[in-house]
Design a protein with these regions (language model features):
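C-terminal capping alpha-helices of c-type cytochrome domains
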Residues: 123-145
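Sec-dependent bacterial lipoprotein signal peptides
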Residues: 1-20
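Bacterial signal peptide processing site
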Residues: 22-25
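Electrostatic cytochrome c docking/interface patches
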Residues: 29-59
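The canonical Cys-X-X-Cys-His
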Residues: 54, 60-69, 118-119, 135-139
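Proline-centered turn/helix-capping motifs that create local helix->coil transitions or kinks
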Residues: 27, 105-112
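Sec-exported extracytoplasmic/periplasmic mature domains
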Residues: 59, 101, 105, 137-144
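Gly/Gly-Pro-rich "capping" loops immediately C-terminal to redox-active cysteine motifs
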Residues: 51, 69-101, 117-123
Length: 145
């Protein structure tokens, strides 16, 4: 019985030591820059290939005519590269997709300096669903760096 107790005690101590070591490693793991207290979950559609395609569509299509190259803003439409959303509440990926899909009618534009409507699905570009996902991925990266 004495040997059994000793084995049990050693096993228990080893388990506690291992668990303590795992716990302290996790506690010391670096927090990603800008993550604050909780790490941000990147939407599944925000992939390097989607971002590259979205960049190409945005900056070579009619998006940049209004929003400026790189989404820096222009006379006709707001900047998309900051945290000050004009039409969106949160700037979530889903919200960005929704705006690209439905557009923004002139009477719904919240900035009095800008009165030009944003066409649904990129207006004349008539973006496909995969292209909308790509443009949304690109725009998402402009504000979620």
């Amino acid at each position: 019985m004495n040997r059994s107790f000793l084995r049990y005690s050693l096993a228990l101590c080893a388990t506690v030591a291992i668990m303590s070591g795992c716990r302290s490693s996790a506690a010391k793991a670096p927090t990603p820059a800008g993550a604050g207290t909780a790490a941000r979950v990147v939407p599944a559609a925000v992939t390097p290939s989607n971002i590259a395609l979205g960049d190409s569509i945005f900056n070579n299509g009619s998006c940049q005519n209004c929003h400026g190259k790189g989404g820096v803003g222009a006379a006709n439409a707001p900047a998309l590269d900051g945290k000050a959303w004009v039409q969106l509440k949160t700037g979530s990926f889903e919200e960005i997709v929704g705006i690209i899909n439905s557009g923004v009618p002139a009477d719904k534009i919240k900035d009095p300096k800008r009165t030009r409507a944003m066409g649904a699905r990129g207006g004349r570009m008539a973006l496909t669903d995969p292209q909308i996902q790509a443009v949304a991925a690109y725009v998402y990266t402009l504000t979620h760096k």
